[in-house]
Amino acid sequence: MGEVAGGRRGSVQHYPLQAIGHHTLHRVHSTHDNNDWLEEAFPQRVFINPVDAAPRNIRDGDQVRVYNERGTLILPCRLTERIMPGVIDIPQGAWYNPDRNGTDRGGCVNVLTSHRWTPFAFATAQHTIMVQVEKAKAP
């Protein structure tokens, strides 16, 4: 008990939310992430169910810190019931943009993934990312 695919024993207690990454409208994988017009139309953000946001005192539009033992990123959030409780969604393809502390500010979901390959695709496990989310502290 307490072990998740691609994770370690105890991951669920420390990282209770599952992160997934969908293909977004404004990028083809990572192509076009530097297009300011598309970023304005489709800003990079994490989607969170209000059920998960409420106990964390997170409101729509807040900057949030998404993290696990592999990495950390900070980006704005969008509260929506379109994401089931217990799951967050970060659109894939954002470019890695670390600050001076190594925290990604670009919203690159890859900073949270394992380097272990999946047995079927021989690629990273994009849908077994266990994370925690909290309201980001002001810089």
Report each predicted region and the residues it spans:
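Long, contiguous, secondary-structure-rich segments that constitute the structural scaffold
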Residues: S30-F47, V51-P139
